[in-house]
């Protein structure tokens, strides 16, 4: 276990990639990584293969996407993270934007306890956790939400169609295959939602292009 912790620490490069982030933010990200490493075996929070590369695969991806999201709409004051699981990108958003209320929605009670523990350990007073299914959420209760590794765009729109209010926006973090998902959206869904690319981006290392998309409910 000590060797794994040392390996994780050795591959931590966020300070080099994001030098503009404050020392407090960097410290919270490092502590969050330690919590993920500690509890992953029991809770299956992320793929074990990604543990040595958490900084690039999970943290950098979430940081870049969340920054793009708030650049797209700086007036967001409450953001839901649907299917939060390990807390990406919701915990990242909470650390970067402490004045924004972040609600993590997760159906697995054990993962909810982990998320609550993370919020406490990182002193994130802007975070709340909902142990529920998205389908069970109150009608038209959500104005802004984000998903990562949740479902394809079409399925995400179907699952969230009741809880997202009119003019509400659902953001989708996607890999380079995002165009295929957009092309597969049924015509009927496009009468309810309007899809759009917000921005493509690349991680600090590698050439793969990722994307943040949004679907606005009509």
Regions found by a protein language model. Name each.
Residues 167-179:
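Conserved beta-strand signature within the Rossmann-like core of class I S-adenosyl-L-methionine
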Residues 157-169:
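A short glycine-rich, Lys/Arg-flanked "PGG" loop and its adjoining helix->strand segment in the class I
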Residues 36, 174, 215:
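Residue-level signal for inorganic ion chemistry
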Residues 40, 119, 164, 185-189:
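Conserved hydrophobic residues forming the short capping helix/wall of the S-adenosyl-L-methionine
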Residues 177-218:
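Active-site capping/gating segments
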Residues 101, 126-128, 169, 192-197:
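Conserved beta-strand segments of alpha/beta enzyme cores
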Residues 1-76, 80, 110-127:
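Class I SAM-dependent transferase core
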